[in-house]
Design a protein with these regions (language model features):
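C-terminal and inter-domain tail/linker signature
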Residues: 1-128
Length: 128
């Protein structure tokens, strides 16, 4: 497994982790202190905000899981990962692409692209 494949596996595992304590541990392990995440509907700066976006997405898309839609690849500290959001074993309802900027094997920035862009917001705190 390449370093980028392992990074992608851990990235998706953090989005799928339902337990807030375990999810936070994954975020702290995977992301740099000054990390940022953006997609068409949210911008999050710092690990607290990134973890809250993940929690909010889980509340808004209950029963769906993030899974890879191919192998991750990359070069020069930048990786890309095609992924899907779907019911376990079912067809994808959203497909996406994560462009991951890394620093010492950790995530520094992730730029997400979604198709289709959901009508709901994943702004931190939404869906509570």
């Amino acid at each position: 497994m390449s370093g980028f494949d392992e990074l992608a596996r851990r990235y998706l595992a953090s989005w799928n982790e339902r337990d807030p304590v375990r999810r936070r541990a994954l975020v702290d392990e995977l992301w740099t202190d000054d990390a940022g995440y953006v997609d068409p509907i949210v911008a999050a700066e710092g690990r607290d905000a990134i973890e809250e976006v993940m929690a909010t997405a889980q509340r808004q898309f209950p029963g769906l899981v993030y899974r890879p839609a191919g192998k991750a690849d990359g070069h020069h500290d930048v990786a890309r990962l095609a992924w899907e959001l779907a019911p376990d074993g079912g067809p994808a309802v959203i497909v996406g692409l994560a462009v991951m900027v890394t620093e010492r094997s950790r995530l520094r920035r992730v730029h997400g692209f979604l198709d289709p862009v959901p009508a709901v917001t994943t702004s931190p705190g939404a869906g509570r």
